[in-house]
């Protein structure tokens, strides 16, 4: 019921936006104050919508493949000998020129560090890269976190702090990067990582995608920096599984699209 209710809220919000967008202009003199009031009402409505989406998003757990997130992936000593070659190299921070890009790579590196831990790989370079990116970004919102490594969790606590500091768009950019990175990793060793999922976890991914796309779509209308993110996550719409079997099949079908989305977000 909870999931249906948020979908209903999203649909109602779309209807409201459509009505306000098509509303005839008032032809009376001195209507600037009226328009200003209407604009304030629209902006407040958008804020309420975004806050609602973030609250729901913050309740969702990370995909069950991450070591420090009570992940269910169990690797044998033999499996740990074959180190993953698909993780983002910590040196990628040198290619992060824009502020949005730095947020996205920070989120992805934090995810990859978790996978490196699972494979008993050294994480010194990840720690150094994450620390450097955090310093470059210099976001006071991160003070609410126990450590910057957990920024990818995109919690409600972090959202509130980033909202206060006027950085909501970066919150959703990190959320998009984190989700794409986790999906990408899952596609690189599907048989192993999919074993960590149950039907609830698979359905949770679908719900996460719906919330993320809704938020990004709304933001892209006001922030041109978010538009590329909207394009990057477009392929995720095909992921609507409610069972593990469906999730595995859909991941296999859109493996290349997920890799392409990752490339867009991390370049």
Please report, for each region that a protein language model flagged, where it lies by residue.
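Non-transmembrane, amphipathic alpha-helical segments
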Residues: 94, 98-101, 105, 114, ...
């Amino acid at each position: 019921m909870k999931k249906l209710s948020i979908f209903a809220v999203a649909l109602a919000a779309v209807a409201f936006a459509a009505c306000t967008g098509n509303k005839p202009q008032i032809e009376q003199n001195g209507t600037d104050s009226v328009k200003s009031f209407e604009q304030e009402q629209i902006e407040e409505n958008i804020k309420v919508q975004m806050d609602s989406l973030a609250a729901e998003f913050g309740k969702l757990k990370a995909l069950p493949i991450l070591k420090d997130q009570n992940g269910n992936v169990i690797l044998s000593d033999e499996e740990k000998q074959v180190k993953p070659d698909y993780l983002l190299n910590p040196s990628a921070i040198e290619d992060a020129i824009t502020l949005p890009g730095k947020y996205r790579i920070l989120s992805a590196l934090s995810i990859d560090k978790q996978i490196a831990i699972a494979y008993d790989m050294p994480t010194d370079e990840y720690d150094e890269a994450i620390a450097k990116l955090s310093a470059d970004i210099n976001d006071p919102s991160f003070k609410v976190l126990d450590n910057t490594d957990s920024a990818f969790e995109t919690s409600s606590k972090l959202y509130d702090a980033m909202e206060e500091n006027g950085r909501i768009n970066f919150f959703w950019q990190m959320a998009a990067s984190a989700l794409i990175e986790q999906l990408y990793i899952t596609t690189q060793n599907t048989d192993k990582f999919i074993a960590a999922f149950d039907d609830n976890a698979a359905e949770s991914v679908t719900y996460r995608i719906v919330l993320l796309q809704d938020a990004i779509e709304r933001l892209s209308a006001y922030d041109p920096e978010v538009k590329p993110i909207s394009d990057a996550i477009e392929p995720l719409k095909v992921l609507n599984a409610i069972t593990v079997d469906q999730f595995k099949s859909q991941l296999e079908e859109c493996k290349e699209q997920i890799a392409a989305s990752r490339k867009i977000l991390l370049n």
